[in-house]
């Protein structure tokens, strides 16, 4: 099962142990699927991100530690060097049907990654800057859109009440694309 062609690519991949081609076990698949639920995202302190733009943005931001990356062979081939510079996390190459099993999307993107949640800052310092306070925004898509728009306006501090959707919900993460 050869992912990359040519002696230079093969040698580089072997030297850096960048990817591994493997079938996901049932247990591992269930574990990733469990991260779709808030209870397990909180328990494991992890969340998932899907799609090339979101995954690369999160890797480049270096705000969240990447734990696992799952990608189709074509994505691995085109992003080997860039990803290896951003993270030491190996990329697991999966086939279409495996990505469909673990994806929240009806048409999965080429890559999905598991990241550690950020630390919540409970100390509210509002002096000299705009802080956005959200109360009972229950729709994940709306919350993600609000976060993306707030980022565009330069708002860096957002406080969500208990009644808001989970900010690590896959739909929220998807809706914040680019911010």
Name these PLM-found stretches.
Residues 91-114:
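Glycine/small-residue-rich loop that forms an oxyanion/phosphate-binding "nest" at active or ligand-binding sites
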Residues 106-126, 157, 164:
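Acidic/glycine-rich phosphate/pyrophosphate-binding loops and surrounding catalytic core
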Residues 124-179:
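RNA substrate-binding interface of SAM-dependent RNA methyltransferases
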Residues 19-77, 164-165:
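Boundary-proximal intrinsically disordered activation/regulatory segments immediately upstream
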Residues 78-88:
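Short, aromatic/basic amphipathic alpha-helical patches
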């Amino acid at each position: 099962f050869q992912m990359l062609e040519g002696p230079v690519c093969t040698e580089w991949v072997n030297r850096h142990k960048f990817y591994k081609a493997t079938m996901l076990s049932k247990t591992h698949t269930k574990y990733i699927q469990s991260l779709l639920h808030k209870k397990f995202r909180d328990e494991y302190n992890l969340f998932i991100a899907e799609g090339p733009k979101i995954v690369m943005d999160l890797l480049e931001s270096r705000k969240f530690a990447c734990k696992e990356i799952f990608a189709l062979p074509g994505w691995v081939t085109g992003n080997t060097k860039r990803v290896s510079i951003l993270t030491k996390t190996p990329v697991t190459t999966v086939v279409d049907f495996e990505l469909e099993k673990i994806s929240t999307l009806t048409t999965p993107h080429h890559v999905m990654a598991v990241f550690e949640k950020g630390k919540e800052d409970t100390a509210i310092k509002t002096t000299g800057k705009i802080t956005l306070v959200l109360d009972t925004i229950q729709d994940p898509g709306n919350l993600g859109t609000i976060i993306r728009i707030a980022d565009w306006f330069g708002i860096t501090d957002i406080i969500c009440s208990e009644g808001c959707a989970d900010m690590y919900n896959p739909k929220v993460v998807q809706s914040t694309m680019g911010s």
